[in-house]
Amino acid sequence: MDDLKVLIGKVATGATLTREEAAAAFNSMMSGEATPSQMGGLLMALRVRGETVDEITGAVSAMRSMMLRVKAPVDAVDVVGTGGDGSGSVNVSTCASFIVAGAGVTVAKHGNRALSSRSGAADCLAALGIRIDLTPEQVGRCINEAGIGFMFAPAHHPAMKNVGPTRVELATRTIFNLLGPLSNPAGVRRQMVGVFSRQWVQPLAQVLKNHGSESAWVVHGSDGLDEITLAGPTFVAALEDGNIRTFEVTPEDAGLERADGDALKGGDAEANAASLRAVLEGKPGAFRDVALLNAAAALIVAGKAKTLKEGVALGAKSLDGGGALNKLKQLIAVSNG
């Protein structure tokens, strides 16, 4: 506790924490040792000053050390967004996950209930008939038998209950909004991560590299979406062969037409689930296109595609051949088995 007071004092002066100091501070918070006032003070001091790559790397270390792990193949991928983009859109990364799985890539998806929309990944999947309150062993069985599994964040990060009340009272974004997508309980090393702000694209790619990721895309749409957008360019930081490259992609790069955000407005969990199922059943339109675009990037990360156009073609085959829909049916069956 005294150590934490020293670290809070350090951050309060505008100084930055080392990875080790950040890990110690977040261990103190997530273990329940820190008081609510100490948590709130540290989280807001970091937020106001701006969190560094080393601080996020250390916080992720603490979070990963306490999570309940899931066994998954080494080549599994995660398609995940931070949420909090305020768009209220349909569940793009969830739909893309089924497309990727239908293309033959194992998906270990990590997610939560809604942050700023009316339907997060967990809400949508539950509305589709998938059981989300599974043990790590049950999720592992889904991944092995269905080729896709969903890890409901609160079930795998029980230590988060110690910081939950403080986060609710602060009612503003904190470093914890960034940590979830970086703390996959299956330990995946191939990630497609959407973030709510352009400022985090390159830093989070660096954090993933620091934690041993082999291949990753961190993305932010120019319209604010925490996905690759159809509305215009998307900012990307790609981790490939130990190097991070930043660039922009557009729908045209993938052979797709632009569409504005209104075409992707979502509803509640039931409405979003129905929209997702319609795409998996072959319905054309903007939701199909944006899901294909994001799936294409995940297929590049998985090493299945070299370009977005190639990824879109593979994804279209997954949809039109019934592979993606079959993955949904398999996950419903295995999760309820």
From Swiss-Prot:
Its cofactor is Mg(2+). It is an enzyme of class 2 (transferase). Its EC number is 2.4.2.18. Anthranilate 2 binds at residue 167. It catalyses: N-(5-phospho-beta-D-ribosyl)anthranilate + diphosphate = 5-phospho-alpha-D-ribose 1-diphosphate + anthranilate. One of its GO terms (biological process) is L-tryptophan biosynthetic process. 5-phospho-alpha-D-ribose 1-diphosphate binds at residues 81, 84-85, 89, 91-94, 109-117, 121. Mg(2+) 2 binds at residues 226-227. Pathway: Amino-acid biosynthesis; L-tryptophan biosynthesis; L-tryptophan from chorismate: step 2/5. Keywords: Amino-acid biosynthesis, Aromatic amino acid biosynthesis, Glycosyltransferase, Magnesium, Metal-binding, Transferase, Tryptophan biosynthesis. Mg(2+) 1 binds at residues 93, 227. Binds 2 magnesium ions per monomer. Catalyzes the transfer of the phosphoribosyl group of 5-phosphorylribose-1-pyrophosphate (PRPP) to anthranilate to yield N-(5'-phosphoribosyl)-anthranilate (PRA). Belongs to the anthranilate phosphoribosyltransferase family. This is Anthranilate phosphoribosyltransferase. It comes from Nitrobacter winogradskyi (strain ATCC 25391 / DSM 10237 / CIP 104748 / NCIMB 11846 / Nb-255). The lineage of its organism: Bacteria, Pseudomonadati, Pseudomonadota, Alphaproteobacteria, Hyphomicrobiales. The gene is trpD.
